[in-house]
Amino acid sequence: MAEYASELFTTGQARNLFIYGKPGTGKTLCAKYLLDQIRKHQKASEIPVLAIYVNAGKTRTPYYTMAEIMRQAGTEVPCAGWQMFRLKRSFEQLLENKSVVIAIDEVDAIIFKEKDPLVYYLNRQPKTTLILISNNVDDVVRLPERALSTLQPVLMYAESYTAEEIRTILKERVEHAFKPGTISDKLLTTIAKTVCEVGDVRFGFRVLLSAALLAEKARRQRIEADDVMSAVEEESRARKIKELEDLRDRLHELKKKRERD
């Protein structure tokens, strides 16, 4: 990270990054930390750098992703009326006096929605550095060859947490959110082992919340084993439904891409 920031503030532009790994492994946290460091260092630097984070999973389309980028850059973008070319023109004017680092989370949500991907356009611009975040490294290698030849991202793999690391994370969350004694260390360890199998620490947060709500509904002050088991089952069902919905959306986007090509 230090090397990355040094490169950015020395030249005004750094190598593109592609952060990938399973859901809930800290990819977003890593990118946001880097952006925070850039904002802190930029105050002491002679090179003005704007750090922007956008979640393409929420913006969903290249247009709304670009619109959100410009809003975070300080441009007042109306909800309707602007076309993509106007957003791009405003972005190019922005680059006349500053560098920009853009982190695009869940980039797979927009990367195949047009023949000329937005990330390809952004990468062609001077003084622009991209941090792309996805659950799948295949998303970057499936970019058009001309985009890959210029993008040339540094790949950063976010490794899954160990059971002990997950337990520590969950314990910190419990200490901040629950009253002392609400859940035993034994049950916390059980949840951590389950989360380790799933590979997504956010699953553990949802299990804790669901288990706490079940205990509250039963008018109990402590979370019991049955609460945890029910919460795991409930959140596992919700997770499978979400995975199926994501797969359906992905297949739909691939079908649309083939039709365009």
Language model segments and positions:
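Short amphipathic alpha-helical segments embedded in low-complexity Lys/Glu-rich regions
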Residues: 2, 16-23, 83-88, 225
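Walker A/P-loop nucleotide-binding motif
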Residues: 13-33
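Mid-core helix/loop region of P-loop NTP-binding domains shared across ATPases and GTPases
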Residues: 31, 48-50, 57-169, 177-195, ...
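Flexible phosphate/Mg2+-sensing switch loops adjacent to catalytic phosphate-binding sites
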Residues: 41-49
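Winged-helix-like regulatory helical subdomains adjacent to P-loop NTPase cores
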Residues: 221-261
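Short amphipathic alpha-helical elements of helix-turn-helix/winged-helix folds
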Residues: 4, 194, 214, 253-257
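Pre-Walker A adenine-sensing motif
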Residues: 1-10
